[in-house]
C-alpha cells in the first residue's frame, strides 16, 4: 500500500543549498514507511532566530537547534491524518554537516527522518529508547544509500 502524503514545505530562509520538495517527500516517506495510509505534515525551514525562539519557548533552551518536532494530538474520538510539524534550522543543519564532515544531503535526510520518527512517538531521552531510535534511523538512512549518521567521520 502506498502512502498518500500531503507535505507542506515552508521556506522562511534564503539558501541556495536547500534540498528539493521531492527530496523532502522521499525522506518523509522513508521515515513513515508502512505505518500509515495517509499523512499530512508541515516542514518549516527557518533562520537561527526563529529556531532559538521556538527552542526557548517549548524546550526551555535558549539556543537554536537542528530540528524541532511538534506532534499533532487529535481530540479524543477524532481520526485525522495530521502528524504535526517539523521546524528545521537551515544554518544549524549546514554547520553540523560541516563540523561532522558529513555530506549535506545525508545530514538533511537524517534530520527529516529523525524529526518524523519523533512525530511517530519515538524518543531518545532514555538510553534504551535512544538505541532503538538510532538503530531505526541508521537502517533508514543506509537504505537511502547514505552512511550511518552516528558513526564518527
UniProtKB/Swiss-Prot annotation:
Gene3D superfamilies: Metalloproteases ('zincins'), catalytic domain. InterPro entries: MetalPrtase_cat_dom_sf_prd, YbeY, YbeY_CS. Pfam families: YbeY. It is found in: Cytoplasm. Its cofactor is Zn(2+). Binds 1 zinc ion. It is an enzyme of class 3 (hydrolase). Zn(2+) binds at residues 114, 118, 124. Keywords: Cytoplasm, Endonuclease, Hydrolase, Metal-binding, Nuclease, Ribosome biogenesis, rRNA processing, Zinc. GO terms for molecular function: metalloendopeptidase activity; RNA endonuclease activity; zinc ion binding. One of its GO terms (cellular component) is cytoplasm. It comes from the Bacteria. GO terms for biological process: rRNA processing. Its EC number is 3.1.-.-. Single strand-specific metallo-endoribonuclease involved in late-stage 70S ribosome quality control and in maturation of the 3' terminus of the 16S rRNA. HAMAP family: Endoribonucl_YbeY. Belongs to the endoribonuclease YbeY family. This is Endoribonuclease YbeY.
Amino acid at each position: 500500500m502506498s502512502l498518500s502524503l500531503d507535505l507542506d514545505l515552508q521556506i522562511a530562509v534564503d539558501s541556495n543549498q536547500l534540498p528539493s520538495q521531492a527530496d523532502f517527500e522521499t525522506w518523509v516517506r522513508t521515515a513513515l514507511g508502512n505505518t500509515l495510509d495517509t499523512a499530512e505534515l508541515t516542514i518549516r525551514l527557518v533562520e537561527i532566530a526563529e529556531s532559538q525562539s521556538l527552542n526557548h519557548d517549548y524546550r526551555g533552551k535558549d539556543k537554536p537547534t537542528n530540528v524541532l518536532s511538534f506532534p499533532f494530538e487529535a481530540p479524543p474520538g477524532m481520526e485525522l491524518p495530521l502528524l504535526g510539524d517539523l521546524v528545521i534550522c537551515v544554518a544549524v543543519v549546514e554547520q553540523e554537516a560541516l563540523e561532522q564532515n558529513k555530506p549535506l544531503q545525508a545530514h538533511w535526510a537524517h534530520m527529516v527522518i529523525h524529526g518524523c520518527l519523533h512525530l511517530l512517538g519515538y524518543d531518545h531521552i532514555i538510553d534504551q529508547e535512544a538505541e532503538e531510535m538510532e538503530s531505526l534511523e541508521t537502517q533508514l538512512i543506509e537504505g537511502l544509500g547514505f552512511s550511518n549518521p552516528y558513526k564518527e567521520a
